[in-house]
């Protein structure tokens, strides 16, 4: 299901690369999409609290993987949290919070590797991919990423998503205000 969930983001990244890259230079776009992320998190938390019987992992089929994958594709836009969008999609579909989070983080692996390969291709062949600094950077990123995911899984299991929504709203408003100055 991870491969199926990766397809929408892969297609969006390839087909709309230039469009998404143009958004990164716009503070207004970043601020707006942070507000959108906040609403996704807030809305999915509200929906999730109303669903009494959560869906088990066996219900994570092709349809659900594609829907969550489309949420991941939206996160190519700056300000849309990839994990926030995919976890929210899982909660909107009725999955338990921990399952939605675990699937979100599994989906991140091919998405991040694919984005890295595209960036490496764009940077060019002159880059030394096996240099000591590249290996050290990869190792540091892998270790810190693992620790961050463990921490976030624990946090998501024990707390609600409202705090993340409030953070996105506050940051989005500050960025939009800065864009107006």
Curated annotation (Swiss-Prot):
Main location: membrane
Subcellular location: Cell membrane
Record InterPro entries: UppP
Record-listed E.C. numbers: 3.6.1.27
Membrane-traversing stretches: 23-43, 105-125, 129-149, 161-181
Record has Transmembrane as a keyword: yes
One GO term describing the cellular component: plasma membrane
Function: Catalyzes the dephosphorylation of undecaprenyl diphosphate (UPP).
Protein name in the entry: Undecaprenyl-diphosphatase
Originating organism: Methanothermobacter thermautotrophicus (strain ATCC 29096 / DSM 1053 / JCM 10044 / NBRC 100330 / Delta H) (Methanobacterium thermoautotrophicum)
């Amino acid at each position: 299901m991870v491969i199926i969930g990766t397809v929408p983001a892969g297609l969006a990244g390839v087909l709309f690369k230039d469009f998404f890259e143009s958004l990164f230079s716009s503070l207004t776009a970043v601020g707006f999409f942070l507000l959108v992320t906040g609403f996704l998190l807030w809305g999915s938390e509200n929906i999730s609290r109303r669903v009494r019987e959560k869906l088990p992992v066996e219900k994570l089929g092709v349809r659900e993987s594609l829907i969550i994958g489309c949420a991941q594709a939206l996160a190519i836009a700056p300000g849309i949290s990839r994990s926030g969008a995919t976890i929210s999609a899982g909660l909107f579909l009725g999955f338990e919070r921990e399952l939605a989070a675990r699937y979100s983080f599994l989906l991140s692996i091919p998405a991040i590797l694919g984005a890295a390969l595209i960036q490496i291709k764009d940077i060019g062949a002159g880059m030394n991919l096996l240099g000591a600094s590249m290996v050290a950077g990869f190792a540091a990123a892998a270790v810190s990423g693992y620790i961050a995911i463990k921490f976030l899984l624990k946090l998501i299991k024990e707390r609600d998503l409202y705090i993340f929504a409030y953070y996105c709203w506050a940051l989005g408003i500050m960025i939009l205000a800065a864009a107006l100055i």
